[in-house]
Amino acid sequence: MSRAILVMGESGSGKTTALRTLDPTTTFIIDADRKGLSWRGWRKSYNSANKNYFQTSSVPKITEVLNRIDKGDLQHIKTVVIDTLNMCMTDDEMNRMREKTFDKWADLAWSIWGILTNIHLYRDDLTVVCMAHSQTDRDENGYMFTRMKTSGRKLDKLVPEA
């Protein structure tokens, strides 16, 4: 059973910058934000030629990459980073914004839930790090709590940080 780590923080708090300390020979970064990494010279270490960097926010493509790392030709990879889950949600929501049915919200919830629940099914020596933006809310009793920022109320019920 692989390990899952959720790293949450406000935008600009250093989540992506912290990745510079990871070993590029055993780390694969899925750049869902498609903005590149935030430190100088990152392209020397993370690129398609090194087979350790891929830009997509498509959940089916992310799942395909994770399956390839798990059982395919990338067995040397020990750490996978998805940066960020929020962009996966936002892109799916925007791509389907003209749809008027409730189904799109159920599909979005299922796709993100699918990533989060399947992480534990990968090989034992694999760690999957999901990066996400955080949101701080107050409940009806005035207690403050921080959770993963989500798109839509259906996804608010997901509690991956628990």
Task: Please report, for each region that a protein language model flagged, where it lies by residue.
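Phosphate-binding/switch region of NTP-binding enzymes
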Residues: Y122, T127-A162
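Conserved P-loop
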Residues: M1-V81, M87
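Short, glycine/charged-enriched secondary-structure capping and boundary segments
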Residues: T21-L22, W42-S45, M94-M97, G142-T146
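Substrate-gripping "pore-loop 1 plus following alpha2 helix"
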Residues: N95-T117, M144-R153
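Switch/connector loops and helix/strand junctions flanking conserved nucleotide-binding motifs
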Residues: L37-R40, C88-D92, D137-M144
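Alpha-helical scaffold elements adjacent to nucleotide-binding pockets in ATP/GTP-utilizing enzyme cores
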Residues: V65, I115-N118, K157, E161
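Oxyanion-hole/transition-state-stabilizing segment in secreted/luminal serine hydrolases
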Residues: K78-F102
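Glycine-rich phosphate-binding loop used to anchor ATP phosphates in small-molecule kinases
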Residues: H76-M87, L108-D139
